[in-house]
């Protein structure tokens, strides 16, 4: 089934070229189907790239989804044209009286700052509080996962001695969990971060379950026992060249950055990267949408939280 997004969003042309079914708003309005209503709070600086990556995964499922793009009003984006934001994005003030089947909170390159020093932290706290009664299930990604774990459960983020950067092997540590259905015994996920949440800190919280982790990258998937909060510390949505872009960007800035691990053949940046996480990324988003949103959300969204 298709994703339903604004007619002129730049991602439309890219996704159509990849044979991902994208439905125009006009066509969708003439179908007698209630699509899942999914909001994406996009706090990445490269918003157009990130929205395309997420829409690619959301559009590769058999479930019709209506997408609402959100941005923090308290933050001025330096890397995305204001015209794009004004045309395709809404602010929290515009949607706070609405209800959603699902919410995705993206990562952001601010993990080395205390949460309270991030200029949109107060607004993000307001959104996460609102989500308890207005969103059925929320998927938090990378720094968004750290922020959600800290806000909802008091789990701290801790500095790493060096950046976790590359594509790493992961293992399931729970069986018979719907989010993990169909996962390989060993699966790969990109990571790009300077901080972590530790197994010990998460394990102290009775309401949380650690579902998957990596010997090198640490805790990866965490879920609340009711399935309404999913936390993914990696970037399964990344496209083939995102880590390459980040590596070259940091080199240009003169930063001390290592070649991303297990990404370039022979760790040679002159070679084409190998994508090992595409299947996992598609399955993660499919399982979240199907088992944690579609099969659980009330038909009348105003019944969320009741």
From Swiss-Prot:
GO molecular function annotation: homoserine O-acetyltransferase activity; homoserine O-succinyltransferase activity
Residues holding substrate: 163, 192, 249
Pathways per UniProt: Amino-acid biosynthesis; L-methionine biosynthesis via de novo pathway; O-acetyl-L-homoserine from L-homoserine: step 1/1
InterPro entries: Class_I_gatase-like (IPR029062), HST_MetA (IPR005697), MetA_family (IPR033752)
The protein's Enzyme Commission number: 2.3.1.31
One Pfam family it belongs to: HTS
GO BP, one annotated term: L-methionine biosynthetic process from homoserine via O-succinyl-L-homoserine and cystathionine
The UniProt record lists the keyword Acyltransferase: yes
Compartment annotation: Cytoplasm
Site (Important for substrate specificity): 192
Keywords: Acyltransferase, Amino-acid biosynthesis, Cytoplasm, Methionine biosynthesis, Transferase
Active site: 142 (acyl-thioester intermediate), 235 (proton acceptor), 237
A GO cellular-component term linked to this record: cytoplasm
Residues under site feature: Important for acyl-CoA specificity: 111
Catalyzed reactions per annotation: L-homoserine + acetyl-CoA = O-acetyl-L-homoserine + CoA
Main location: cytoplasm
Role of this protein: Transfers an acetyl group from acetyl-CoA to L-homoserine, forming acetyl-L-homoserine.
Family, similarity comment: Belongs to the MetA family.
The protein's name in its UniProt record: Homoserine O-acetyltransferase
Lineage, highest ranks first: Bacteria, Bacillati, Bacillota, Clostridia, Eubacteriales
């Amino acid at each position: 089934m298709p994703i339903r997004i604004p007619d002129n969003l730049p991602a439309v042309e890219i996704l159509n070229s990849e044979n991902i079914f994208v439905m125009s708003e006009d066509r969708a309005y003439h179908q007698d189907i209630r699509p899942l209503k999914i909001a994406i709070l996009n706090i990445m600086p490269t918003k157009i790239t990130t929205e395309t990556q997420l829409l690619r995964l959301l559009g590769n499922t058999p479930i019709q989804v209506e997408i609402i793009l959100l941005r923090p009003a308290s933050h001025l984006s330096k890397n995305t044209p204001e015209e794009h934001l004004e045309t395709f994005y809404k602010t929290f003030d515009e949607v706070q009286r609405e209800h959603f089947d699902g919410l995705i909170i993206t990562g952001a390159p601010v993990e080395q700052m205390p949460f309270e020093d991030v200029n949109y932290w107060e607004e993000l706290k307001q959104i996460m509080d609102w989500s308890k009664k207005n969103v059925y299930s929320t998927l938090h990604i990378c720094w968004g996962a750290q922020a959600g774990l800290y806000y909802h459960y008091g789990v701290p983020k801790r500095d790493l001695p060096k950046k976790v950067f590359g594509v790493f092997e992961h293992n399931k540590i729970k069986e018979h969990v719907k989010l993990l259905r169909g996962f390989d015994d060993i699966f790969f996920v990109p990571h790009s971060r300077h901080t972590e949440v530790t197994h010990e800190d998460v394990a102290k919280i009775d309401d949380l379950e650690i579902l998957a982790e990596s010997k090198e990258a640490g805790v990866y998937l965490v879920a609340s026992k009711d399935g309404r909060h999913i936390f993914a510390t990696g970037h399964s949505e990344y496209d083939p060249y995102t880590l390459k872009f980040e590596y070259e960007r940091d080199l240009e800035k003169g930063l001390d950055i290592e070649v991303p691990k297990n990404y370039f053949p022979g760790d040679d940046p002159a070679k084409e990267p190998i994508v090992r996480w595409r299947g996992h990324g598609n399955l993660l988003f499919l399982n979240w949408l199907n088992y944690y949103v579609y099969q659980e959300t009330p038909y009348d969204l105003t019944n969320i939280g009741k």
